[in-house]
Curated annotation (Swiss-Prot):
Modified residues (Phosphothreonine): T32
Expression across tissues: Expressed in leaves, roots, stems and flowers.
Family stated for the protein in its record: In the N-terminal section; belongs to the glycosyltransferase 20 family.
Species in which this protein is naturally found: Arabidopsis thaliana
Residues with the Phosphoserine modification: S5
Protein name as catalogued: Probable alpha,alpha-trehalose-phosphate synthase [UDP-forming] 8
Amino acid sequence: MVSRSCANFLDLSSWDLLDFPQTPRTLPRVMTVPGIITDVDGDTTSEVTSTSGGSRERKIIVANMLPLQSKRDAETGKWCFNWDEDSLQLQLRDGFSSETEFLYVGSLNVDIETNEQEEVSQKLLEEFNCVATFLSQELQEMFYLGFCKHQLWPLFHYMLPMFPDHGDRFDRRLWQAYVSANKIFSDRVMEVINPEDDYVWIQDYHLMVLPTFLRKRFNRIKLGFFLHSPFPSSEIYRTLPVRDEILRGLLNCDLIGFHTFDYARHFLSCCSRMLGLDYESKRGHIGLDYFGRTVYIKILPVGVHMGRLESVLSLDSTAAKTKEIQEQFKGKKLVLGIDDMDIFKGISLKLIAMEHLFETYWHLKGKVVLVQIVNPARSSGKDVEEAKRETYETARRINERYGTSDYKPIVLIDRLVPRSEKTAYYAAADCCLVNAVRDGMNLVPYKYIVCRQGTRSNKAVVDSSPRTSTLVVSEFIGCSPSLSGAIRVNPWDVDAVAEAVNSALKMSETEKQLRHEKHYHYISTHDVGYWAKSFMQDLERACRDHYSKRCWGIGFGLGFRVLSLSPSFRKLSVEHIVPVYRKTQRRAIFLDYDGTLVPESSIVQDPSNEVVSVLKALCEDPNNTVFIVSGRGRESLSNWLSPCENLGIAAEHGYFIRWKSKDEWETCYSPTDTEWRSMVEPVMRSYMEATDGTSIEFKESALVWHHQDADPDFGSCQAKEMLDHLESVLANEPVVVKRGQHIVEVKPQGVSKGLAAEKVIREMVERGEPPEMVMCIGDDRSDEDMFESILSTVTNPELLVQPEVFACTVGRKPSKAKYFLDDEADVLKLLRGLGDSSSSLKPSSSHTQVAFESIV
């Protein structure tokens, strides 16, 4: 169900779109279920019809390109389509049962005229279960060739556009085209989705803001995303002008997948540095708390399709070509490279490394050949042309220097190579060399291992001898961590690469066999089907609680996100609390200080005149017992709040308590051994000196290490380490080590805001003035103790009448409190309303403006 606030934002938001001529959104219209046609041009606030009754499990796979091959029939002039068996989107079906229905959304690799689009759409849906997204030629070029290939692709591969030859500078029009294209994809998904049952799986960096459009329309959509390219470090990514929009787009998913932990770590670091989000690992699953939703992170490299490779290996043409290659290079060691003509594949570095190999090991001349198959470039530009020129020049230089009339150490194959021929080279090669300087995954090593294993029907590959293989792979490619038996190299260190190739070539047969068996076992058990099934299982787990929470849609445009909270969690309003406040005679009010009455700040810490005025108004009512419960020291709080004579203060989390300004400070804690301070201070000081932007606060009862002004990642990392360090050092001391919001605190055992609130309520009961209403407001972890303690205390049988309790957190976030207020301004508005109510016989109409938000 779509929340009303979300639906309202659909009309209010202003998307960053370009005005491209497009096919009307309702043409072609697509049947999702017999007899039901969805029409996204209708009222966006209307309910979505659920068709789950007779539908089977369905996955919607959204990618830039459909897994189809297209051509026009020469005789009829009609378009003909067939499955692209090499497409990952098609191969991932192997991970699911035959009962699972797949629907594909994406573009075709050909341009379809506008007057043919409806006919083609119906044909694709009926025959292939595919939904085509038709982009105009101009939009396609700006979206794919422009933003994707000339801005995102270089940046994600660590190339900054500092010079014209290093990627294009950011172009706002290309970004608008990217957003426009993603919007068209979302329109097509909306036409066919059954949001209550379908799972949507988005593939790769072309569609990183698509989740925002879908989440905006369907708050509880089941949405996964997998990034097939690297994700750069935060220092690189933060240079992107639209960095926040893309991060928020990805965070509108339920599950985000990466090939390696490095890529995931960089993404998490960006979320921490740019959006202030923390993550944690529970039972092996990494999760980001994002406005009440947990966005899970999946780390699993994609695999190959074993059946596809083995079927090609079994072909007679493959066997014949394998024998031909073996005969051609008889008596020589064959090193194989298969790469796209791309500046990131490191082909020229590979050739230079081979040149160093021949320079260093002269005896290998005439005995080693590198066959480099060059796949066509996926994009064009000066950098691709330069890479191609350098590759040919380097190969020619090596062949002229080390070759003979009947021997070429470098064999360049720069043409469209049939699949059977590539497979034959894989099967015949003694060593596979992958030298990319940056690559998302790269499945060449996997294919090489499978082809070296062979099949029983391929007599050219399979005989009675053990299977062997050797791999030299770059440490900068996604498959490297999975290949523990490979020789990993830094592609920039050509001497080390040359040495690695030499080591691979002279490796013993036994060692080659052991390494091969280890690789083949992993690859055969972690194929593309395993990858897809594992991802979908995690996505189902991530979406399990979708309907147990209520949703708010907040934010405009690409800043949209969904706030997901408990059904009982609601905003506390003046209108709701004033009637209870007025009918009760004794009230206890507990207020946090930082982040509740005043904003969190390391600079301005004293309260404003308005805060003091509101507190004075509350304290002047003799029926109110008002306490500030804070972690700050008693001296600071006394000075700041001195005008409020009847205000109670529980300083240092309740270690010191004073009921009124003229009363003496009291503590219920016996003086503890303070030797622990001499143990803690040197540790904290050491971390402070090592971590720029941190400080130590010396309290009478505690020591606090603050890292609010430190680098977010480094400060958080240091806080975790110091927590472990101090817990170990203080294991036998009567103190506890607590981590709070940007702090690590060491304090005596049994000191907490919850216990302080309990003490106040207990003393009110003993005085014969049990509270009839209790309100507590706070914003951080320490206040959760107060909420929990008060909620349990008020059920005490000593209280003859159970008081009304209003536990309220500041900020819409998961909490033990039942209510929330948005910020400090909201808190003051509420307190001002209560103060005015104390001095008036009737509720003031000017303070009944805030009401419960409508939640659907």
